[in-house]
Amino acid sequence: MRRTATLAEAAMWHLLRDRRFSNVKFRRQVPFQNYILDFVCFERRLIIEIDGSQHLDSNRDERRDAVLASDGFQIIRYWNNDVLQRRNVVLEDLFAKLGLDHD
């Protein structure tokens, strides 16, 4: 587990922490089944991963996602650049995927 978050992870955590996102409780950097989850909401079985260029064409990510999906999790991935430069698009996508209304 890393001690410091990437800039994109810190930006996403600012949006999610303290139930700021539609009162949904997220935890960050959570060890689970030999993996470290960037952000997880156990109540909704939802994982959010923030990816950099090291994740391009990553078979390891595909295997990891398959294992977590088989345990009932939905995995949503966003690119670092999108979180940092297109925050509104990321939020709209997240609201839509969760079926949530927002102001």
Q: Which residues does each predicted region cover?
A:
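Solvent-exposed, charged helical/coil patches
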Residues: 1-24, 99-103
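Basic, amphipathic alpha-helical patches used to engage nucleic acids or provide basic targeting signals
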Residues: 1-6, 28-100
